[in-house]
Amino acid sequence: MIPGMRATPTESFSFVYSCDLQTNVQVKVAEFEGIFRDVLNPVRRLNQLFAEITVYCNNQQIGYPVCTSFHTPPDSSQLARQKLIQKWNEWLTLPIRYSDLSRDAFLHITIWEHEDDEIVNNSTFSRRLVAQSKLSMFSKRGILKSGVIDVQMNVSTTPDPFVKQPETWKYSDAWGDEIDLLFKQVTRQSRGLVEDVPWLDPFASRRIEMIRAKYKYSSPDRHVFLVLEMAAIRLGPTFYKVVYYEDETKNMRVSTSVNGGVGIVSACTRYCVADPELLLESLAEVKHSAMTRRIRDVEDERHRQVKPNKQAKDRLETIVNLPSSQVLTREQRDLVWKFRHYLRQFPKALNKYLRSVNWVHPQEVKTALALMNDWELIEAEDALELLSSAFTHPAVRAYSVSRLLEAASPEQVLLYLPQLVQALKYEQGQQLPEEGNPVPVVSEEEGKIPSVATTPTEELEGRDMTVVTKKEARKAASGDLATFLIDYALASPKVSNYLYWHLKTEIESTKESKEEHSKMYQNIQDRLMEALVKRPDTRAQVDSLHQQQIFVEDLIILMNEAKARGGRLNESKSAEFRTMLSRAKHMLDLKGVHLPLDPSFRLSSVIPDTASFFKSEMMPAKISFKVLQPNGKADRNIPEEYTVIFKTGDDLRQDQLIQQMVRLIDIILKKGQLDLKLTPYLVLSTGVGQGFVQCIKSKPLRAIQEQYKAHKMDCIREAMKELRPGDGPFGIEPNVIDNYVRSLAGYSVIMYILGLGDRHLDNLLLCENGKLFHVDFGFILGRDPKPMPPPMKLTSEMVQVMGGVKSKQFLEFVQHVDSAYRILRRHSNVLLNLFSLMLDAGIPDIAAEPDKAIFKIEQRLRLDLSDEAATKHIFTQIESSLNAKMAMISDIIHAYKQNLM
C-alpha cells in the first residue's frame, strides 16, 4: 500500500437519483495536452484554440454547443517540457439538467483553432477542427462519471458526433499490481474515502502525475488528451454518486448502506408515497353533479325561468367568451348547465353548452339534443368547432353540417374546404354505399342556392349550378359530412376540382400512417367521381380531372429527367428543361386542360422559353402557360399567360394552410373596414411532396437591395421611386406608399400571430404597386432555424421607406398594426377552430407538437388582455422587432450562403 493512503473504516455507497437533480450539468475543461502532429502539414503549430462541448440524448442534439472563452496559449517552454498545448481551467454550464439526461447521454467534445486570415463579413470568424472525441456520461452500470477524466482525442478535420471512439486511456494490468493499486487509491481519494495527510499529499500528487504521464505517453502513437473534470455531488464530508433513474418525483432520495458509516445519517432517507387517486376526479363532486343534473332533467316551467344574478351573468359572459381551445372546469360546466335555458338566446353559448354535457348519460344527452334544436342559430364559423374531434355524437355533427349549408356562403365552403376534408376523419362509418343503394345526388329541378363561379370551358360553361331545396339538402346532409361535400361539389366545378385534389393528397399522406383513413378518403373520392358521372351536366368534370392528373404526371416526369440530364449547374438543368418542353408535343398542345391550381383557366400550351429552375435544394420549376381564350378571342378579364411554380419534394400543405389563413384574415379585416392590401396567392398540394404555387409578378427585397445598394438604407425607396414616380411622399405615387404601409402592417401582424419563421429578404417580395408580401412558409408557430428571431420582420431599409420611425407613414403603420390586432382578437375563434381541425393533418410544424399548436396561437393573441393592454403588448413587439440585432446578422449570413450557391 502506498504510504499515507489509508482507507476509512467503512465504505458505504451513497447515491442520489439523477431525476432528483434539478441543476444544470457542469463540466470543467482543464487542459489540452499531448504531442500534436498534423500529417498533412508537419510544421503546423496550433494557436488560438478553444474547446466546444455538445450534449446528445437519445442520439439527438440538446440545445446549442457551449465553448470556452479565449485564453492565451502557453509559452514554448511549457509546451516542450509538460506537453501542454492549451490551458483553460474553465467551468462550462451545459444547457440540460441532470434530471433530463437520458441513459445513453454523451458529450461530443471538439477542439477548434481560429484562423485569423479569413473573416466573413466582419462578423463570423472561420475555424478549423483540430480534434474531437465523445464521452459517455454514464458508466455501463448507470453511474454518472465524476472527477478528473483524461479524454483521448482523435485528430480530425470533419466534426462527427457519432465518431467511433477508442477506449478512454486506462492503466494496464501489465504494469503490475502496485500501479493498479495506486490508481485505485487515487479514485478512492477523490470520493473522500482516503484520509488526507496535509504534509504528504502535495508530494504524492506530483509523483502520481509523473507516473501517470509516463504510462500515458509510453505508446508509440502520438496521442493528445483533453483533461476534463466532471462535477461531483457532495453533502458535508460525504460524496454521493449519481445513479441514473427515471422518475417524475421531485423529492430527492438519499440512500446509504445498512451499516451506515462515518458522516452518514440513515434518518435522512426520504421516500415518496404514491397516491393512486392523484389527478382523478373527486367522487363526491361527481356524485353531486349527477344528482344536481338528474333533478333538473324534469323540464318544467319553473326550471325554464331560472335566471342568473349579476355575479352569475358576469361569470357566464366570461365562460362564453373563452377561446374554443380552452377546456372548461367542472364548476364552469355545471354553471352553464344550470342556466342553459337562459343561454339559449345567445348563439355563441351553444358550443360551451355542448361541451358541458355528459355524453355518457342517456337522459342528459336526450335533453341536450332537444335543446340544441331550439337554440338560437349559430354562425358557420362556430359550426366548424362542432366538427372537431371533441364532438363525436352524430346528431351534433349533423347539426353542424346543416348550419354550414344554411349559413355558409359558397365562398366560405371553398375557403374552409381543407378543414372540412380533415374533419372527415372524425366522422363515423364513412364507407362505400352497398350495391343497390345509389349515391345520393342533387336534384336538377328543385330550388337553387348561390354557386361559386363556373369554370370557363365549352363543356361546363353556362352549366346550371343547382342543388336540392334546402329542406331536402338538410335531409341529405344530416347523414354525414361527406354527402354534404359531394352535394356542393356537384353544384360547383371549382369545389369538385379542389375537393378531388384534397382527397388525393390525403389518400397518399395517410396510406402509411393510418391505412383506414386512406381507405376512407378513397371511398369518398370514388363516391365523388360516381356522382359526377351520373349527372349529364357534370360528366365533363370527370374528364377534366383525368386530364389534370395526366398533365401533372407529365410535368413531374419532364422535371425529373431535366434534373438528371442537365449536369451539375442550375443553368444547364434549366436549359435542358426548356429543350425538353419545346420537344414535348403534348405540352405544346394541352387541349385546354384546366389548371389544377385555378380551374377558372384553361391552358393552351406551355411557353418553353420561360421555364427555369430555382436555386434551391429541391429545385422547383417556374413555368408560364398560354391561357386558352373563350371563342378564340382576347378577353380583358382573362390574362394571356399564367405563371406558376411547380414543386416536387416539398410538402406544400403547410404553405397551403398559411395562405388560407392570409385569405381568411384579409376577409376578416375587410369586414372590419380595414383593407391592408394583402396578397393571398394560390397554393395547391396535388399529392405528397408536389404541388402548384401561383407566381405573382414581384421582386425579392434581396434583389432590390443588391440592385440599388449604392443608395444604402434608401435602396427600397429608390427602387419604388424609379418604378412609380409621382407627387406623393418621397417623390412616389401616393397609393404606392399607402399600399406599402398597409401591406407591411398586415403581414407584420400575420407573422407575429402565426409565428412565421425563417424570414429573410429573399422571401419578402415587393410588387410594382407597392404591395409587400411573404412567401415560403417552411417554419411556423414560432419554429425558426435562426437563433432569437424577431416577432416581426422590420429591417432598417423597410422602415426607411416610410421615412423612419418619426414619420407620419410610420405612425400610420403602427395604427394599422394595432387595428388589425384588435380585429383578429375579436375573431380568434375562427382561427383557432380552423387550426384545431388541422391537428391530425400531418403538417410538419403542427405534427411536431400538436398539443401545443393551438396554445401558441392563443398565447400570441393574448386573449387574456383587455384591448388597451393588447395595444401596449403589440407596440412592445414592434419595438422589439426594430431593435433586433440578431435578425440583421442572420440576414448577412443568409446572403453570404446564397452568393455561394
UniProtKB/Swiss-Prot annotation:
Tissue specificity comment: Ubiquitous.
Enzyme Commission number(s) from the entry: 2.7.1.137
PROSITE patterns: C2_PI3K (PS51547), PI3_4_KINASE_1 (PS00915), PI3_4_KINASE_2 (PS00916), PI3_4_KINASE_3 (PS50290), PIK_HELICAL (PS51545)
Keyword Methyltransferase among UniProt keywords: no
Top EC group: transferase
Catalytic activity: a 1,2-diacyl-sn-glycero-3-phospho-(1D-myo-inositol) + ATP = a 1,2-diacyl-sn-glycero-3-phospho-(1D-myo-inositol-3-phosphate) + ADP + H(+)
Protein name: Phosphatidylinositol 3-kinase catalytic subunit type 3
Taxon lineage: Eukaryota, Metazoa, Ecdysozoa, Nematoda, Chromadorea
Gene of this entry: vps-34
